[in-house]
Structures are given as C-alpha cells and as structure tokens.
Amino acid sequence: MALLPDKEKLLRNFLRCANWEEKYLYIIELGQRLPELRDEDKSPQNSIQGCQSQVWIVMRQNAQGIIELQGDSDAAIVKGLIAVVIILYDQMTPQDIVNFDVRPWFEKMALTQHLTPSRSQGLEAMIRAIRAKAAALS
C-alpha cells in the first residue's frame, strides 16, 4: 500500500493536473492508497451523517497526543476525498484540528468548485464531524 503524500506534495500534484478529469482520477488514486478499515470500525459511531455515500471516519489519539485518522467509503471518489482530508489533518493535535481551516487548501486545489453539491455537502459533513470529535478531545 503506497503512502499518502504530505500537504505540500498533495497541492503540487493537484496543480500539475491539466484538467478536472485528471484531478478526479488522482483523488480516486489517493482513496485506493488508504488502508482497509476494519469491519468493527464501520460502526454507527464512526459513520458520517450528511453524506450520500456510506462514510466512516475513525479518530484515535496516540500517546504523543497526535490524532490518527482512518476512513472508508463505498464510493471511490468519496474515499479519495477522505484521503485528502486525512492528508490535510495529518500529524495534528485535537486543538490543531479545531483551529485549522481547510478551505484555503480546497481553494488552492480548486477542489470544491468541481464537486457536485451533494459531494461538497458530504465533504463539509466530514470536516464538521472531524472537528467536533477533535473538540471533544481537546
């Protein structure tokens, strides 16, 4: 399983894409790089409401206080969007997550302007859920 890029490399890779179709394929590729989520993690408490597809995001805090995120979806593009979100929140504490605004990153990648309204709403639901869980831990 290939590793996910860091934030800066993610942005560079997005900017190298010639058109939205290439970005779409790259998002799907990122989703394919995510490790499989265990069946027991596909539970109601990890389910994200507000997404058209089934989405699960698991948040764990390691001994150093850093949040580790895992996620899965039954839709390839959504799984890729989960990967993008995981990359953006990588190596953050709960307070870092609460304070971090992902929107400028989405704007730099021209991500949300090419998503359908339902995908954009689902992406926002993921961000809200992650921030709420992080706030509860901080």
From Swiss-Prot:
Active site: 51
InterPro entries: Cysteine_desulfuration_SufE (IPR023939), Fe-S_metab-assoc_dom (IPR003808)
Record's keyword annotation contains Metal-binding: no
Cellular component terms (Gene Ontology): cytoplasm
Family stated for the protein in its record: Belongs to the SufE family.
Subunit structure: Homodimer. Interacts with SufS.
Function according to Swiss-Prot or TrEMBL: Participates in cysteine desulfuration mediated by SufS. Cysteine desulfuration mobilizes sulfur from L-cysteine to yield L-alanine and constitutes an essential step in sulfur metabolism for biosynthesis of a variety of sulfur-containing biomolecules. Functions as a sulfur acceptor for SufS, by mediating the direct transfer of the sulfur atom from the S-sulfanylcysteine of SufS, an intermediate product of cysteine desulfuration process.
Protein's name according to its UniProt entry: Cysteine desulfuration protein SufE
Gene: sufE
